[in-house]
């Protein structure tokens, strides 16, 4: 049976992931990980490598087939890399979403998550075009 891990870091993310979680819980082994407490501890530390390290250990132990992440928070690239190096398939929800109100960091972080992801779920046609443009701009991914 397939094992999938949903990772979120705040209540709003959980609300958006909940329909996906409920769908997959019907047919798969599903784990939901709330990293919000870990993130709060690290905000003063600023060492985001600890998130990578923690996820790498957990993913190695649990042997997930997929991880599912949402959005563009600054800790997500570290989670993505842990899964990527363990050959766990990555599902990026809200891929390609760009907003004028987002900080410049968000505009860089989202593609950093989408590129190693195996699946990008876009919420709009504009987002889908952004993801397609991103992949066309990288010669070895064409």
Which sequence ranges carry the predicted segments?
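Helix C-cap/helix->beta junction micro-motif
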Residues: 28, 86-88
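An aromatic- and histidine-rich active-site surface loop
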Residues: 68-86
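Structural motif
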Residues: 7, 69-70, 93
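Glycosyltransferase specificity loop/lid
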Residues: 2-61
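Short glycine/serine/threonine-rich phosphate/pyrophosphate-binding segments
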Residues: 14-18, 73-79, 128
């Amino acid at each position: 049976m397939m094992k999938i891990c949903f990772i979120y870091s705040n209540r709003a993310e959980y609300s958006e992931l909940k329909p996906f979680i409920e769908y997959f819980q019907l047919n798969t082994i599903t784990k939901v990980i709330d990293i919000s407490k870990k993130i709060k501890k690290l905000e003063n530390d600023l060492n985001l490598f600890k998130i990578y390290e923690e996820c790498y250990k957990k993913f190695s132990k649990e042997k997930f087939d997929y991880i599912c992440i949402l959005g563009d928070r600054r800790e997500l690239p570290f989670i993505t890399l842990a899964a990527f190096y363990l050959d766990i398939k990555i599902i990026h929800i809200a891929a390609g979403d760009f907003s004028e109100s987002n900080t410049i960091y968000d505009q860089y972080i989202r593609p950093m998550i989408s590129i190693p992801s195996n699946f990008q779920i876009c919420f709009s046609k504009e987002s889908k075009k952004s993801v397609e443009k991103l992949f066309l701009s990288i010669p070895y991914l064409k």
